[in-house]
Curated annotation (Swiss-Prot):
This is Large ribosomal subunit protein bL31B. The gene is rpmE2. It comes from the Bacteria. The keyword Ribonucleoprotein applies. GO terms for biological process: translation. It comes from Chlamydia abortus (strain DSM 27085 / S26/3) (Chlamydophila abortus). Residues 97-108 have a biased composition (Basic residues).
Length: 108
């Protein structure tokens, strides 16, 4: 087997950027930054969302206002006129005729 093909697996300190929550987990993440946590020095990985800040785990639900979204859409596109199809292009387009199938002959 080839040597040094697998990345180094080590304990890494993950820091939630939004809440400041820190936890240690095994990972192959490589970082130049290190931080002391609970008396040991770990490489640091900053994450934007963790179990401390995700709405599913915290129980805080952010409801989407469906009517507000519709109003926002109408406000944005109320001044836009719908595109009219060109009459010449519609009239010149030939109708597609269905092909007739040959009659089926019955065997005697």
């Amino acid at each position: 087997m080839k040597k040094n093909t697998h990345p180094n697996y080590q304990q890494v300190l993950f820091v939630d950027s939004s809440t400041g929550y820190k936890f240690v987990c095994g990972s192959t993440y490589q970082s130049d930054k290190t931080e002391v946590f609970e008396g040991q020095e770990y490489p640091v990985c900053y994450v934007s969302v963790s179990s401390a800040s995700h709405p599913f785990f915290t129980g805080s639900k952010r409801l989407v206002d469906a009517e507000g979204r519709v109003d926002k859409f109408l406000k944005r596109y109320s001044n836009v006129k719908p595109a009219q199809p060109a009459q010449a292009a519609v009239e010149e387009a030939p109708a597609v005729k269905s092909k007739k199938k040959a009659p089926i002959k019955k065997k005697k």
